[in-house]
């Protein structure tokens, strides 16, 4: 089932300059975020229940969250050479993050936006991975 949903949002190969490496990394990250037994800390993947308990406008919490997520993703995704994590939205019921990724063997950065939506993470940019 997850395989089908990923195929539905992946960019079309024809007429798109998206490399297989970029598509693979984005697909694997989305799978990692949505895995019920993810190796990422629960606040990072099951974000909303834990996020609502804290003050989402707390800049220290936001900074901590970004650092923890960056560290975990660099550990679990060896194809990432450099990573910057930014919170785009952080409200009680909304969490949107942007990952600025530099991959090994790729000269251009990759932007991958994720949004917590209805109990799971979805890509806000997977259709337009560049």
UniProtKB/Swiss-Prot annotation:
Superkingdom per UniProt: Bacteria
Family: Belongs to the GpW/Gp25 family. IraD subfamily.
Role noted for this protein: Inhibits RpoS proteolysis by regulating RssB activity, thereby increasing the stability of the sigma stress factor RpoS during oxidative stress. Its effect on RpoS stability is due to its interaction with RssB, which probably blocks the interaction of RssB with RpoS, and the consequent delivery of the RssB-RpoS complex to the ClpXP protein degradation pathway.
Record keywords, A-Z: Cytoplasm, Stress response
Keyword Cytoplasm attached: yes
Subunit structure: Interacts with RssB.
GO cellular component terms, semicolon-separated: cytoplasm
Molecular function GO labels: anti-sigma factor antagonist activity
Subcellular location: Cytoplasm
Keyword Cytoplasm: yes
Gene Ontology biological process: cellular response to oxidative stress; DNA damage response
Protein name as annotated: Anti-adapter protein IraD
Primary site of residence: cytoplasm
